[in-house]
């Protein structure tokens, strides 16, 4: 189960330079399954950071949360495919047409080839968002209603899964079924601080709830022993998988 659990652990490369990113990739390759590249690192380094990770044999989650007019997002989706990422995401709040356009672009790009397409994920509600945050932007529905609603919208648009807090995993499973990937940030092992995440669980709890992939950054990066921290998280995930 350790190998399977390791494939499900995504390390967030929330760093300020390509050199720092490469240092982490060298340190953690083989210890985690996927490396997440977000807006800060991608804006600083561009596509080269994705190529660097792949050159080291790593998989990439391109976490840019595309949200624009459908044509623009569809073209961005094609560029993500060209980079060879393992998964990337769009904002579910962008609507059905935007998500469906991205899904169709991915299908068409891989239609004639033998390569495996990336997982296309919809971002539901950010784990840093509370109901007060939603009310500030005019959304009066509770988080536990909005998340499965957006997940169903994403599935109907042809996406492969969603990004959501582990607290809503059960709601998504009931609404969308088992054959729908759920990637969960907001995961904090017992030995780590919660930081700015609001709706969190431990790695074991998240896996037990039905998460397919866990995104972890600071609990590993801020540890005195990052490799050991990653291993402890993988072991907790593996134990939950065995119990499940």
UniProtKB/Swiss-Prot annotation:
One of its GO terms (cellular component) is cytosol. Substrate binds at residues 14, 36, 63-72, 127, 188, 197, 217-218. GO terms for molecular function: orotidine-5'-phosphate decarboxylase activity. InterPro entries: Aldolase_TIM, OMPdecase, OMPdecase_AS, OMPdecase_bac, OMPdeCOase_dom, RibuloseP-bd_barrel. Pathway: Pyrimidine metabolism; UMP biosynthesis via de novo pathway; UMP from orotate: step 2/2. SUPFAM superfamilies: Ribulose-phoshate binding barrel. The active site is at 65 (proton donor). It catalyses: orotidine 5'-phosphate + H(+) = UMP + CO2. It holds the Pfam family OMPdecase. It is an enzyme of class 4 (lyase). It comes from the Bacteria. Catalyzes the decarboxylation of orotidine 5'-monophosphate (OMP) to uridine 5'-monophosphate (UMP). Homodimer. This is Orotidine 5'-phosphate decarboxylase. The gene is pyrF.
């Amino acid at each position: 189960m350790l190998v399977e659990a390791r494939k499900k652990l995504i390390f967030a490369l929330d760093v300020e330079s390509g050199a720092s990113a490469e240092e982490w990739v060298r340190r953690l390759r083989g210890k985690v399954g996927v490396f997440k590249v977000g807006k800060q690192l991608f804006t600083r380094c561009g596509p080269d950071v994705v190529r660097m990770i792949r050159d080291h044999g790593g998989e990439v989650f391109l976490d840019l949360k595309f949200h624009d007019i459908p044509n623009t997002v569809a073209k961005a989706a094609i560029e993500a495919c060209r980079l060879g990422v393992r998964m990337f995401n769009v904002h579910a709040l962008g609507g059905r047409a935007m998500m469906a356009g991205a899904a169709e672009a991915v299908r068409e790009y891989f239609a004639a080839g033998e390569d495996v397409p990336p997982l296309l994920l919809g971002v539901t509600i950010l784990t840093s968002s509370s109901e007060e945050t939603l009310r500030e932007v005019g959304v009066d529905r509770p988080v536990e209603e909005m998340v499965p609603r957006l997940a169903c919208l994403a599935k109907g648009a042809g996406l492969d899964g969603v990004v959501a807090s582990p607290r809503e995993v059960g709601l998504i499973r009931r609404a969308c079924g088992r054959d729908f990937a759920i990637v969960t940030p907001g995961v904090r092992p017992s030995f780590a601080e919660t930081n700015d995440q609001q709706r969190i669980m431990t790695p074991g709890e998240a896996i037990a709830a039905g998460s397919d992939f866990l995104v972890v950054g600071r609990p590993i990066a801020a540890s005195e022993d990052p490799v050991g921290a990653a291993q402890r998280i993988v072991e907790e995930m593996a134990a939950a998988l065995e119990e499940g």
